[in-house]
A protein has these predicted regions:
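A short beta-strand motif characteristic of beta-propeller blades
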Residues: 38-45, 79-86, 128-139, 177-183, ...
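Extracytoplasmic/luminal low-complexity segments enriched in Pro/Gly and acidic/polar residues
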Residues: 191-305
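Non-cytosolic head/periplasmic domains of membrane-anchored proteins
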Residues: 71, 76-203, 211
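Structural motif
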Residues: 13-17, 21-22, 69-73, 111-121, ...
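Beta-strand-rich domains and repeat architectures in extracellular enzymes and scaffolds
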Residues: 38-71
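Short, exposed beta-strand/loop patches in secreted or surface proteins that constitute
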Residues: 52-55, 63, 93-96, 145-149, ...
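Sequence/structural signature of beta-propeller modules
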Residues: 1-50
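Conserved loop/turn motif of beta-propeller repeat scaffolds
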Residues: 58-62, 100, 151-153, 196-197, ...
């Protein structure tokens, strides 16, 4: 059911964003007949013990991890392929690039007797793996806590931590040069790069604060609620969630160049998980209600079954 739900969510949101929400002043209704049911074009079998199941931006591919290995499936043919790592290295983290059929992978590999963490990209069209850069030497207990990137500026941010106080955020630029990024706060949980600005937005869940880099600044909001970064859309609009319990009850949103006092705010009909909140290409906020099997555009009030 989890896999089916994922397909439905991504597919529905893709259709809503690319078809229903196309920017146009005219609307034309047409009858569409399908020669074959859409379900006939999907043939997916994922092992029951698979983890980290993810889907590519346009739905052509699905991926999952099993142990420290990564597999990819073509959703149309059902072909399952193992993604090979350098020197049989361990996949520590992966995600699909936004608006690209390409995977970003952080892997632990042994080079000349030393364990390293390196960043690579994988192209499913030709099975090509490209080294971006080595991140750091691997130390016991290290985990990749967060990764964010911009396909518009070709910049990556990688946050690495372990249980011994090692916490580092690295910025990798278009030339694959790597820099340390100093962060404020004591409990970074979520971080996203502004697509066209190369500024990192991140939250500190311990102190319920939101920060921006370049320069490193705390964003101030007129609320007593706990705050959490939900995401940033392709138009550089930042979405901050007001937290009630462990769910989002309201959203404050705007651009980094604007005073936060002028940002918009909206209340949700009922608290939602941050993972069920999305944004379309027009910077409208969508909430996926799995129980009621519908998606609501809370910016316009429209609902889509």
């Amino acid at each position: 059911w989890a896999i089916l739900s994922l397909i439905i969510q991504v597919g529905a949101l893709f259709i809503l964003d690319r078809v229903i929400f196309k920017q146009s002043s005219a609307f034309e209704s047409k009858k569409i007949e399908l020669d074959k049911p859409y379900e006939d074009k999907i043939n997916i079998k994922i092992p029951k013990d698979a983890d980290e199941i993810k889907i590519s931006y346009n739905g052509k591919y699905m991926s999952y991890s099993k142990g420290d290995k990564l597999n990819m499936i073509e959703t149309k043919s059902g072909k399952d392929k193992s993604i090979e790592t350098e020197n049989k290295g361990e996949v520590m983290y992966y995600e699909w690039l936004y608006e690209r059929d390409m995977i970003v992978i952080l892997e632990k590999v042994n080079k000349k007797g030393k364990d390293k963490i390196q960043l690579v990209t994988y192209n499913p069209k030709n099975s090509a793996t490209t080294l971006v850069t080595e991140i750091c030497d691997f130390k016991s207990g290290m985990k990749i806590k967060n990764v964010t990137e911009s396909v518009f500026t070709s910049v990556y941010y990688v946050y690495v931590s372990n249980n011994e106080g090692y916490d580092r955020c690295y910025r990798i630029d278009i030339n694959n040069d790597k820099f340390d990024v100093p962060l404020k706060g004591a409990g970074m949980e979520n971080m996203k790069v502004i697509p066209h600005k190369d500024r990192l937005i991140y939250d500190d869940v311990v102190n319920s604060s939101i920060y921006a880099t370049s320069p490193n600044t705390k964003l101030k909001f007129n609320t007593n609620n706990k705050l959490r970064l939900i995401g940033i859309d392709r138009n550089d609009v930042i979405y901050i969630g007001e937290v009630s319990g462990d769910k989002i009850s309201g959203i404050v949103y705007g651009k980094i160049d604007e005073s936060t006092s002028k940002w918009n705010s909206i209340k949700l009909d009922s608290p939602a998980n941050s993972s069920d909140i999305f944004f379309n290409s027009k910077s409208e906020i969508m909430v996926n209600n799995i129980l009621e099997e519908k998606i609501k555009n809370i910016t316009t009030g429209k609902e889509y079954p």
